[in-house]
């Protein structure tokens, strides 16, 4: 281990030793992730991090992902530029949790509890997750397949959308500009009048980025309408649409010419919810869809490609749950889900637009269905002891049925602290690409399966809160592309055995100063996973004085695996690097705020995706207006 991780841990230990004697009950967070009803985290056996809107907006980032990467131990998000992640070859935005990869569909992103992933490739589309829609983000570390099913194998990121709680009208406008021709802007309006509330927002951003032919442009909007029929019943409908255009230059040593992407993603959902003293529940319908058009480019600038890759996909479903307190200390949740997953991948001629006939499974269409039922029961046996158990039966139209159990216990030896133990199973059904698309595809694939064993401790004091997690992951049936005879084939031949530790702490020194830090240590016994660092540490400081707010964060990455061949195997390792980011906000008055951000202020030379060196120091500045 290098000296800088040790120094960051020493600072954490010194803070805990100095301030642990100040014991008082802090305001506890309530969450909806990992449990369908609103629940105090002290009674849940799993670990959930909450990143609120103030944290999401203090650095004026357009995406939620850079912020949650800093705030959540064990989470890594890949990047290749100042703005934009892109899709297809060379894309960034891959999300890793404890060495379990969202790029392989093993980590699930939700919007208001509804799954979001590409119906062809099974992975999240990271450019879709914009800050303007989010009231808060809840991140569950570890499997959550009992509640959410397939893909919630390594963890869950749940984006809880914004809503207005008090009567009134609020309008926010934010604009900014900075390095490499980067321009960002967004506007939102929230209204509540009696039983009706609404939220409408729009966003635009563009940049040239730091390499030639790496431009990125994005625009989109979000709409949410809600109505409270009675104090106990309400309904809402929301929609989110985003479109981005991206250019792709290839690796720095292997340039690609003419590569471009035109991507549209959308989400629509509607729900009816009930909330009584002893029971609460919801019935919702949802769909997320995509339209992709991609020019893969050419290694020879004089020989442009003659076709576009295109895809259409949709994930449409119905979700129902009802949670009830049957007697003192009890909570029973019953639920059922149905999902229809559609994917269509094909090529068209650039000149005529005609659909092309392609050999070797280069094109394909797939329809898959999943239906599931589940229950989760939580019981306080005594005031200091809670037991939790859940079970899901999930049936896939191709791979068959899968039983998913979880068990947990929470012991509260102090009114301000709890020990949690959790054993849970996660799984992932194979994607359309793995079963039907390209020569290695295999229609006989089975679900990937994973068991997670976890022990954690949380303690909340007057000004200090801290926690620690130990985990062990044992996964099998991992889908790998394997050499079989003279060709390659996707097989359930892989295994993952990861274990590690995570530490986190927050200390509010006084009204002006606050510190937060988190650290994760990961050991991968089988092989190193791409973009899963062996150590990730973060130390942040917030300073507020009158109208001035300053936020600074120092992130240290060690043992980051890189894939130099494109086969998904970490065959190289990036040297350790330290990133210093800072944001400054100055409130001129109650309406206008001036802001400035700096990233990689130490001008580090590093890469997260092999062949895509990151920019050195970059800057943004702008203004926020609140009416």
Task: Describe the residue ranges of each PLM region.
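Gram-negative outer-membrane beta-barrel transporters
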Residues: 380-383, 472-474, 491-563, 587-593, ...
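Structural signature of Gram-negative outer-membrane beta-barrels, strongest in the C-terminal barrel
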Residues: 230, 327-331, 357-475, 508-512, ...
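Short, acidic, small-residue-rich periplasmic hinge/interaction motif at the N-terminus
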Residues: 21-57, 65, 465
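Flexible loop and strand-edge segments within Gram-negative outer membrane beta-barrel domains
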Residues: 207-214, 218, 232-315
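Short strand-turn segments of transmembrane beta-barrel domains in outer membranes
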Residues: 156, 161-191, 202, 207-214
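Short acidic/polar hinge/loop motifs at secondary-structure boundaries
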Residues: 114-141
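Outer-membrane beta-barrel signature, preferentially recognizing the C-terminal barrel domain
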Residues: 107, 252-275, 311, 366-368, ...
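Extracytoplasmic beta-strand/coil segments of soluble accessory domains associated
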Residues: 66-114
């Amino acid at each position: 281990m290098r000296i800088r991780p040790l120094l960051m841990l020493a600072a954490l230990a010194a803070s805990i030793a100095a301030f642990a004697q100040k014991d008082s009950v802090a305001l506890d967070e309530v969450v909806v992730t990992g449990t369908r009803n609103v629940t105090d985290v002290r009674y849940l056996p799993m670990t959930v991090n909450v990143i609120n809107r103030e944290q999401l907006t203090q650095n004026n980032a357009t995406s939620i992902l850079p912020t949650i990467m800093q705030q959540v131990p064990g989470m890594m998000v890949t990047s290749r530029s100042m703005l934009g992640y892109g899709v297809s070859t060379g894309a960034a935005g891959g999300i890793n949790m404890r060495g379990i990869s969202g790029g392989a569909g093993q980590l699930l992103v939700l919007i208001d509890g509804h799954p979001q992933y590409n119906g062809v490739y099974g992975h999240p589309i990271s450019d879709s997750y914009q800050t303007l829609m989010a009231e808060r983000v809840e991140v569950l570390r570890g499997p959550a397949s009992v509640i959410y099913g397939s893909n919630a194998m390594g963890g869950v990121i749940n984006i809880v959308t914004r809503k207005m709680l008090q009567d009134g009208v609020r309008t926010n406008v934010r604009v900014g500009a900075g390095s490499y021709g980067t321009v960002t802007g967004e506007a939102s309006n929230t209204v509540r009048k009696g039983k009706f509330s609404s939220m409408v927002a729009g966003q635009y951003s563009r940049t040239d980025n730091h390499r030639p032919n790496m431009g990125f442009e994005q625009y989109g909007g979000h709409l949410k309408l809600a109505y409270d029929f009675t104090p106990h019943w309400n309904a809402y409908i929301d929609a989110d649409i985003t479109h981005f255009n991206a250019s792709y230059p290839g690796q720095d040593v292997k340039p690609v010419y003419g590569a471009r992407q035109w991507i549209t993603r959308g989400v629509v959902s509607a729900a009816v919810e009930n909330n009584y003293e002893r029971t609460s529940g919801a019935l919702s319908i949802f769909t997320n869809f995509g339209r992709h058009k991609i020019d893969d480019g050419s290694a020879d600038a004089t020989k442009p490609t003659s076709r576009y890759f295109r895809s259409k996909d949709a994930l449409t479903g119905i979700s129902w749950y009802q949670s009830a307190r049957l007697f003192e200390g009890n909570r029973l949740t019953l639920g059922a889900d149905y999902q229809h997953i559609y994917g269509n991948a094909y090529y068209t001629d650039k000149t005529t637009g005609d659909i092309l006939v392609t050999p070797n499974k280069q094109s394909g269409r797939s329809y898959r269905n999943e239906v599931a039922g589940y229950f989760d029961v939580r019981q306080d046996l005594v005031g200091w002891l809670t037991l939790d158990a859940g079970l899901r039966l999930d049936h896939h139209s191709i791979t068959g049925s899968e039983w998913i159990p979880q068990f947990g216990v929470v012991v509260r030896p102090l009114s301000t602290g709890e020990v949690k133990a959790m054993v849970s199973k996660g799984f992932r059904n194979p994607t359309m690409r793995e079963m039907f698309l390209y020569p290695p595809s295999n229609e006989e694939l089975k679900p990937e399966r994973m068991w997670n064993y976890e022990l954690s401790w949380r303690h909340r004091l007057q000004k200090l809160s801290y926690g620690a997690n130990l985990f062990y992951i044992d996964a099998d049936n991992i889908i790998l592309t394997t050499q079989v005879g003279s060709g390659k084939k996707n097989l359930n031949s892989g295994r993952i055995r990861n274990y590690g530790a995570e530490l986190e702490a927050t200390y509010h020194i006084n009204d002006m100063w606050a510190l937060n830090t988190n650290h994760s240590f990961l050991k991968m016994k089988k092989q190193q996973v791409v973009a899963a660092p062996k150590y990730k540490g973060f130390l942040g400081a917030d300073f507020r004085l009158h109208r001035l707010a300053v936020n600074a964060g120092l992130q240290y990455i060690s043992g980051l695996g890189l894939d130099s061949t494109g086969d998904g195997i970490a065959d190289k390792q990036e040297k350790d690097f330290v990133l210093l980011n800072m944001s400054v906000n100055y409130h001129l008055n109650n309406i206008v705020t001036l802001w400035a951000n700096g990233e990689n202020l130490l001008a580090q030379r590093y890469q997260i995706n092999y062949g895509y060196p990151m920019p050195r120091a970059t800057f943004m500045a702008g203004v926020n207006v609140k009416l």
